[in-house]
Amino acid sequence: ECLQTLNGHSDWVPSVAYSPDGTKIVSGSGDKTIKIWDANTGECLKTLEGHLLQVESVAYSPDGTKIISGSDDKTVKIWDANTGECIKTLMGYEYSVLSVAYSPDGTKIISGLGDETVKIWDTNTGECLKTLNGHSDWVRSVAYSPDGTKIISGSVGGSIKIWDANTGQCLKTLEGHSEGVLSVAYSPDGTKIISGSWDNTIKIWDANTGECLKTLEGHSSYVSSVAFSPDGTKIISG
């Protein structure tokens, strides 16, 4: 049953996320704006403007006080989730920012880029701490492990990489998708990784060994988004 339809954007919406307490929803759109919605009523509470091109990815900070956004305008912006004010703009990118995520402790931001790299940023200073090189195509999805010690990234080239979040070293490369990887996520306990791909499949991987445990088939087109349920027993895909 569809409970709500949130209308307000004037272009497609490539990214949505719930606030940690579940009371709000944030959406990023091709209309260059970010909207904050009341999750219960569906009312648009705020429209955040400042990006010059499409907003590709949005995420809440773990404490729910901030929102980050990545855009085709080659910037990441940090916003105050209550006031809607832009607190910081992280610059220095040469390509689109396709994916953003917070570390579990909220002190770092990671971004996946059109230049085949992943960047790690300090949220307080706005300084780029590390650039992770190794992918051979756009990095479409990034995520931290629940304990914050590892980073995963999925590339349009078809590979998934596991990185040491402190050193930036590539620990493993997971290969098995026949086309680009559009979405990656860790299980809540950090033992598994799921990936959605242009090859219409979802794969479940062992996060320690890198072994592909299962391939889930059933979609008739590409899988652009995957996520685990909070208890780790279910997977949703779109």
Name the predicted role of every residue range.
Residues 1-238:
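A detector of tandem-repeat and repeat-rich interaction/domain scaffolds
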